[in-house]
């Protein structure tokens, strides 16, 4: 559903959602003479496709920027620790990074223990298959885990627009006092 009616309806829902803290609150919010849930049902008849809100993402930060990828299939939000001249461009660039590189966490502290253990085990299995001595596996696996964090955590990823600096370094080059506080990525499959 990409017709003008749907796009306008989606934009109006976004304006309501920005003041909500949960999907339940959004669905029960007033929309014209009914609530959002009822409006979704009504619009299903108007647009001709079933409409539902599949997810609701919230970031509490001093500044939140966004990016909608071409084709409207990926949307990202990025929270910054402060608002300043240039925060809109910075947050959009980082949100584009999130859309393109799909990081699993902000930093290595955000990576679950299960994923870390799985990555270490995968690394050890690869090393065993290569015939590496068992005594060396732990140290080599730690190095592979560092590489995994560099590729999979947002602040450690290579910044896609220059591929020279990390996302962290890019943020600091724009504003020394700014930090990325959170990000969300939603994709239609």
Predicted segments, located by residue:
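N-terminal assembly/interaction segments in proteins that build large macromolecular machines
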Residues: 1-189
């Amino acid at each position: 559903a990409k017709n003008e009616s749907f796009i306008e309806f989606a934009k109006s829902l976004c304006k309501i959602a920005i003041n909500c803290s949960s999907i339940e609150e959004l669905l029960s919010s007033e929309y014209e003479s009914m609530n959002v849930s009822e409006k979704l049902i009504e619009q299903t008849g108007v647009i001709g496709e079933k409409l539902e809100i599949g997810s609701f993402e919230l970031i509490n930060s001093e500044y939140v920027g966004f990016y909608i990828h071409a084709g409207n299939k990926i949307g990202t939000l990025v929270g910054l620790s402060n608002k300043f001249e240039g925060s809109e461009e910075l947050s959009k660039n980082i949100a584009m990074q999130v859309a393109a590189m799909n990081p699993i966490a902000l930093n290595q502290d955000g990576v679950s223990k299960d994923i870390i253990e799985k990555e270490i085990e995968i690394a050890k299995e690869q090393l065993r298959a290569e015939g590496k001595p068992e005594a060396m596996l732990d140290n080599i696996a730690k190095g592979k885990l560092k590489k995994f964090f560099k590729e999979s955590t947002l602040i450690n990823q290579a910044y896609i627009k220059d591929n020279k600096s990390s996302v962290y370094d890019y943020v600091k080059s724009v504003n020394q006092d700014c930090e990325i506080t959170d990000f969300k990525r939603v994709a239609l499959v």
